[in-house]
């Protein structure tokens, strides 16, 4: 087996240089990095992980000990724990016990030889603290999860007694029904807390008639079937969601004539699930926070025990509140944009129909067709809800939409649920609430994380520009990095182009210009509320676009979907796209899957895209339309929508670990919305602003300047003339 000494001899460098290269340190010249990497590849060198740990004196390995990985709550926990650990440059080892004490003690005996730095354990041991201590594990190195071992140990979990009381109050109000409760024969602390709180909350007569079924994991099917021989209770309460799933299957197969309600704490379900009445606990969040807490304990060497209880999501309500009486319509007609967001509405609307009997019918039109229809209000008379692009809202709101507060004065209360920067930009004009955000999007910078972190490329960039290779904060940096990664300019680049541009249509060309303009100016209107494009900043924005020509694919992309597809093909180092098109980057066919970094756009003042849903003045069923809007645009439906289309509105949705794991750019999207400054005039000059017309003027001249038909100075003069002629 080749050694570092062999590599040093082959490459003609010192062993210290080899060590620096293999450990990813950036203090070696690009030429020596190339020599070492070539020699290592030629000799077939592989890193001896155990030897490296011994040299370092500590490892970057965390172990997770779980009962199993078949229960969905543990799968959610582990995936989230692993993701957080990897983001901090730690690896994870997974061990499963099947709740077998002997097996867990065998695992403990191996932990030191496996050289783990810390352990997160859902332990089945009654003497867990003592067992881990005997295994040479110090108190700050182990974090007990879900099942509390002792008040003298580090612990994180949920308030399981609170869940028990919640279901106990529900049962106490249910009347004289026979209740069943299913728990482990030797319940762990979480189940014990749930069961005690549940039974203490029941009425005396219910406690006397409570059917208690005790099971073990390995024999749960047999034990539940045996207990049901004496009759099936009308309502079941279970401390374990996995046992609830087992009970459901047994009832469906062996007692199809019975349909008892099944109530249980459960992991969080982003998509609707209708088999159980659930009290949801966010195990994905538990995984993240457990990893964070364990690493904090390791860093601080803290011996003072911490006991952390996370808040529960509780019962997330998917139901629709429909007033009693008749007069409800058979259907609601929606005018929507032909786009992926429509699939989410069509899918989730089926739940609304199941509960209310009201069908949701969708008419799909293009961006330009919807604008044309909005310009002719009589064409909207058959629609109850319409989709408006964010650039349409100011121009059309008070002409064609019904102010929502006229129908329901409390509607403004729902604005508090939206993430910062979304509510006002997608809902309001001139102090009135006209729409609810449904599909907001914002510009984000996507870059090849694998290239930006490549030791060789970082060193070459440092040598060439005397700067660190990192995501660009300014467009000057963006241009420099684009040049560096363009192979025609730098033969060492692994990709063909450093960046991309989307200029094929007027509206998208305007976005490319405005992103650069707004990086230097937050103001688009003067003190009198009139459009006032700064000539110098505008000229610089056009010059930046023109100067980027050698470093982008030609011809430039026509639409954002083309831009996303181009980046996912793997031949570009950076791209700026709207967040609603980022799904393309994580498709199975994407060549950049797992290699993507996301950041704020240069200048940190992105543009908005996407749109809202409002109720036209001619709607025949405005109250029912508003009821549907409130249901569709609020939690938990909002999170289900986001899981389907990658577009989030509510703050709770951005905090949803399921969605964060599916769409890794969500945190940057939320931050981007909070940075946006409005294109519309200041509120004191709140007159309708035809943003689409303005962007078309900008886009047309941007295209001409890029094609060389106008100089930047001529193009900006043309823009100012067109604005005066058409918009003043």
Stretches found by the model and what they are:
Residues 588-655, 678-687, 700, 713, ...:
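Extracytoplasmic/periplasmic substrate-recognition and gating elements
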Residues 390-444, 476, 595-599:
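Hinge/lid segment of periplasmic solute-binding proteins
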Residues 557, 654, 667-723, 727:
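C-terminal capping/gating helix-and-loop segments adjacent to ligand/active sites or protein-protein/ligand interfaces
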Residues 479-484, 516, 520-558:
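Glycine-centered hinge/linker elements that transmit conformational signals in sensory
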Residues 122-166, 264-276:
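Flexible loop/hinge segments that line or gate small-molecule binding clefts
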Residues 1-2, 41-79, 88, 113:
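N-terminal helix-turn-helix/winged-helix DNA-binding helices
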Residues 230-239, 245-323, 329:
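Flexible loop/turn connectors
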Residues 1-58:
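N-terminal helix-turn-helix DNA-binding module of bacterial transcription factors
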